[in-house]
Amino acid sequence: MEIEQIKLNGDERLIDALKSKGYTDIPSNVILDKTLTGIGATYAELHSCRNSIIIEPNVPVIVGKAAKNSDWLAVYSDTTVAQIKKYLKRTDVKYKKILTTPEGFKKVRKAADKSYSLIQETYFCLFDECEKLTQDCDYRASILQPVYDFFDFKEKAFVSATPLEMSRPAFEEQGFRKLKIVPQYDYRKDLHLIVTSSYERTVREEFQRLKDSPCVCIFLNSVTGINELVNSLHLEGESRIFCSEEGGGKLKDAGFTNAVSSIDYPLAKYNFFTSRFYSAVDIELNVKPDILILTNLNNAVYTTVDPYTEAIQIQGRFRRMFEDKQTFNSLTHITNTRDLGALSREELDKQIDEYKITYQSLIERYDKTTNSARKTSLKQQLKQICEDYLLDERLNIDYFGIDNKYNDCLLYTSDAADE
């Protein structure tokens, strides 16, 4: 894929850097690698002079951004098709701005009805935090629902500060290229990594170290793990938990009432965030926080934090820069270790090759046979591959699912040390 580098000076936002290269807006058919969080990619699209559909991975960022302007529409589980139809008909909004979850996208398509093809011709489609397609598709297949529609838009782009490599052929077929933002200053942040065999003791010691901090933000992708920490450290009266509504329900059943599903101020002294808050959302504070990232592999593998994406995204949630030009006091990641038995890259290559051979054989036999019983049997066998998230809902090869397996290989094996 062709790569174009664009310099970003210290006093510039993304749109300034783009304009220096002759782009008035985010161009079409690009994967925009911002390098830095918080430089205004979504902001640029929301304020562009064109109609836009912006796909965000989770609800909190959608609700937060749409609340800033009554001319922007948030589409998620609570939004009805009728509300979207009403918005599309508004004549007082010159440039429509629709922010939607991947799951909410089908409501936009349904609301547009016969005008949907016109929307694909005239709206710019921006898929924000695009690495989530690869990272989340194994447990959240619905995140891929808009993918086919996305590539049917005349103008579209992927964007993230931490994009992953994507193998879907459509990128090459449609001539996608990468725009790489290159900051002209040292933007690195110090992170204190603590690898321990005594997770509970180390976490307790870290909380003791942070007892005088005005605000501690803890990122741990386990509602159960958060609940255990709150109880064992007796933080009930001075903590808040930010998680999904489902997670909040579990906490309520456990007797914890101070859990919310979107950013809500003021924050407490101790604030816990699950993975839906790792990217995209803005956390605005009047005090400089201490950030603590926790990975407990003995509790759950899904508490693993990807150092190439999630760790970068987490520290980027904090937008306010204080007098010392910093956005936080400290950034610490505590993790234990465990042999996860993951495949090596070489082993995974062989496994994927076998899947593809099996798929090709089954699909050819399925297309050739006219016997309904045989078709049913072959379709069931294809669905078995689909259950391993290597086929999508149309029974085509799911390249994001394959990319997910390679990303896990990098994350969970010693191969990561070679990258």
Task: Locate each region found by the language model.
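Conserved SF2 helicase motif VI
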Residues: N299-F322
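SF2 helicase motor core recognition
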Residues: G38-Y43, K106-A111, N271-P289, Q313-R317
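Conserved strand-helix element at the start of the C-terminal RecA-like helicase core
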Residues: S52-I62, L210-N231
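Conserved helicase ATPase motor motifs in RecA-like P-loop NTPase domains
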Residues: D33-I39, E131, V147-P169
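SF2 helicase catalytic motif II
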Residues: S117-L144
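Conserved small/polar residues in nucleotide/adenosyl-binding loops
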Residues: Y412-E419
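Interdomain hinge/linker at the junction between the two RecA-like core domains of SF2 helicases
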Residues: P169-V203
